[in-house]
Each structure stands twice: as structure tokens, then as C-alpha cells.
A protein has these predicted regions:
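FabD-like malonyl-/acyl-CoA
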Residues: 1-107
Length: 107
């Protein structure tokens, strides 16, 4: 199995994105603490808050990395070898998540 990942940039965020993600994921909890919000989804319902760069970019990066963690747990090909991952790319702020997944940056 060959897998390629594309991480979106700002403008694609909304409160109900990634409904399957575990809300107790440490990356999401750390993000909430950094943004001083008890619930990132509730905060995202405020479109003004959600469109602020300082909020949206942190949310998108943390959510992308949390989704990557969960994907690794559920895709057997990624559990045994990262060689199945043939390409990662990101648009705008998504480039940070792509660089982390590629091993160029640490989360």
C-alpha cells in the first residue's frame, strides 16, 4: 500500500472538522492550553476567533498532527513501516505538519 498525505492550509478549518479524533489526544489538550480555551471546537464556532491567524494556524497544525497520530494507529501499513508513506505535502500552514510527518521538524 502506498500512502500520500496532503495537509490543508488556513481557510479550511471549522468547528466540526475531524469528528473522529480523540478529544483527549495530548496534542489537542496542549493546543487548548496554549490557546487558553477549554474546548477548541466551541472556540471554533466563533468565526472571528477561528479566522484569527494566531488561533487558526495553531488549531490546524495541532489537528493535522493529532490526525496523523491516529492514522498511524489505525492503518496497519503505517504501523509496521513508514515506507508505505511515499509523499507528504502541505499548503501554507499545512507545510509545518507535512515537515513534521516527514521527519524534518519535530512536533
Amino acid at each position: 500500500m502506498k500512502i500520500a498525505l496532503l495537509f490543508s492550509g488556513q481557510g479550511m478549518q471549522y468547528a466540526d472538522m475531524l469528528p473522529w479524533m480523540n478529544p483527549a489526544n495530548p496534542l489537542l489538550l496542549q493546543m487548548q492550553e496554549q490557546l487558553h480555551v477549554p474546548d477548541w471546537r466551541a472556540a471554533m464556532r466563533d468565526t472571528r476567533w477561528a479566522s484569527t491567524n494566531a488561533h487558526a494556524q495553531v488549531v490546524l497544525t495541532a489537528c493535522a498532527l493529532a490526525a496523523w497520530q491516529e492514522l498511524q494507529e489505525h492503518v496497519p501499513a503505517l504501523q509496521t513501516s513508514r515506507r508505505s508513506l511515499v509523499a507528504v505535502a502541505g499548503y501554507s500552514i499545512g507545510e509545518l505538519a507535512a515537515a513534521c510527518v516527514a521527519g524534518v521538524l519535530s512536533a
